[in-house]
Regions:
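Helix-turn-helix DNA-binding motif, specifically the short coil turn and the N-cap/start of the second
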Residues: 31, 42-45
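Pre-recognition alpha-helix immediately N-terminal to the DNA-recognition helix
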Residues: 19-21, 79
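Beta-hairpin "wing" of winged helix-turn-helix
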Residues: 54-64, 71
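Conserved segment of winged-helix/HTH DNA-binding domains
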Residues: 2, 68-86
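Alpha-helical residues within the helix-turn-helix
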Residues: 37, 48, 54-55
Length: 86
């Protein structure tokens, strides 16, 4: 990974809500409502941050009937978050 790519990833993860969302999704995939309950923030805020994470290729949605579940798909992001947890 070059510095430009690393900078883009770090910029996205630089927001505390997005970092918390990614951390939660690393533990287990979940839908918007579960994230709202876990983080105690408005659904619209969670949806905005999920869209940004999805647009950057950090998370992917998966449909389960009418529910969309999200999971972290970028291993570089997983490594970064693991380092930050230490």
């Amino acid at each position: 990974m070059d510095f430009r790519e690393a900078s883009k990833i770090l910029k996205v993860l630089g927001h505390p809500v997005r970092l918390e969302i990614v951390h939660n999704l690393m533990r287990d995939e979940c839908n918007v409502n579960n994230i709202v309950k876990r983080l105690d923030i408005p659904q619209s805020t969670v949806s905005q941050h999920l869209r940004i994470l999805q647009d950057r290729g950090i998370i992917n949605p998966r449909k389960e009937g009418v529910i969309t579940c999200y999971s972290v798909v970028d291993d570089r992001v997983r490594e970064i978050v693991e380092i930050l947890k230490e």
